[in-house]
């Protein structure tokens, strides 16, 4: 099976980022995905890299990730997603969960 690699960049209203240098959550498995956040000085921007077997949903990925950036105000971060046929709502939920967990790690 061929995998599609997508790359996006988003402007962020904020430069809120995670404190750990990186954070990983999830497992690539049937209908799910894994996400990694990497802290990086990007002038407030967000870079997103997606590896997926699903062809033809580039615009959906872009809109979902743009919504995540706009909703959370996160910036100065690289988001890497390894997808295994997760639906858009599952992807959105997983990246929100990962950010919540990464933020919780900061409080410890």
Q: What does each of the following model-derived ranges do?
A:
Residues 1-108:
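N-terminal intrinsically disordered, cationic/polar leader segments
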């Amino acid at each position: 099976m061929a995998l599609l690699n997508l790359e996006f960049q988003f402007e962020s209203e904020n430069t809120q980022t995670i404190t750990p240098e990186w954070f990983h959550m999830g497992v690539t498995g049937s209908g799910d995905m894994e996400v990694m956040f990497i802290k990086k000085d990007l002038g407030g921007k967000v870079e997103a890299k997606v590896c997926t077997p699903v062809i033809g949903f580039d615009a959906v990925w872009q809109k979902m990730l743009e919504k995540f950036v706009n909703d959370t105000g996160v910036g100065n971060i690289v988001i890497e997603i390894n997808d295994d046929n997760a639906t858009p709502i599952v992807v959105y939920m997983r990246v929100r969960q990962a950010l919540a967990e990464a933020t919780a790690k900061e409080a410890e």
